């Protein structure tokens, strides 16, 4: 057994991807098209995006060692790319609920979802590098 103190490590890739996943979930509460939120405009895609985001957050939980097994980096990358494709498809092809003359204007929610899904991809790619931050607690010295 090693007598060295063990420093908790935070995996950078899953952390970045999880921040992106939270942005995707938050974006669904915001307007995607002309005062229509993501949860209002979609029938199934909103639930799919939430499930993909939660799967990404599960990779962080696994990387922190809070559950037994973490999803492989390949699965995390596949989930992230699928999320980007779904969000990008909504930029190109508007859902029927948002269709109208000349098409609806895009609002902050869709752009936040695109940024969040992009962060998910960046985090999944960083997950392959297995970069982590070590956290070390030090005592304060009594002398100024």
List the model feature ranges, each with a label.
Residues 1-144:
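Compact integral membrane and secretory-pathway proteins
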């Amino acid at each position: 057994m090693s007598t060295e103190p063990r420093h908790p490590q935070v995996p950078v890739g899953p952390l970045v991807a999880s921040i992106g996943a939270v942005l995707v979930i938050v974006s669904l509460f915001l307007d995607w098209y002309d005062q229509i939120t993501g949860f209002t405009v979609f029938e199934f895609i909103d639930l799919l995006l939430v499930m993909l985001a939660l799967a990404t957050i599960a990779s962080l939980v696994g990387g922190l060692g809070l559950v037994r097994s973490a999803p492989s980096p390949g699965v995390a990358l596949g989930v992230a790319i699928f999320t980007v494709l779904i969000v990008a498809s909504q930029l190109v092809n508007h859902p029927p609920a948002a269709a109208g003359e000349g098409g609806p204007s895009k609002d902050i929610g869709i752009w936040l979802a695109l940024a969040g899904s992009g962060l998910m991809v960046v985090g999944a790619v960083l997950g392959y590098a297995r970069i982590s931050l070590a956290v070390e607690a030090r005592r304060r010295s009594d002398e100024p």
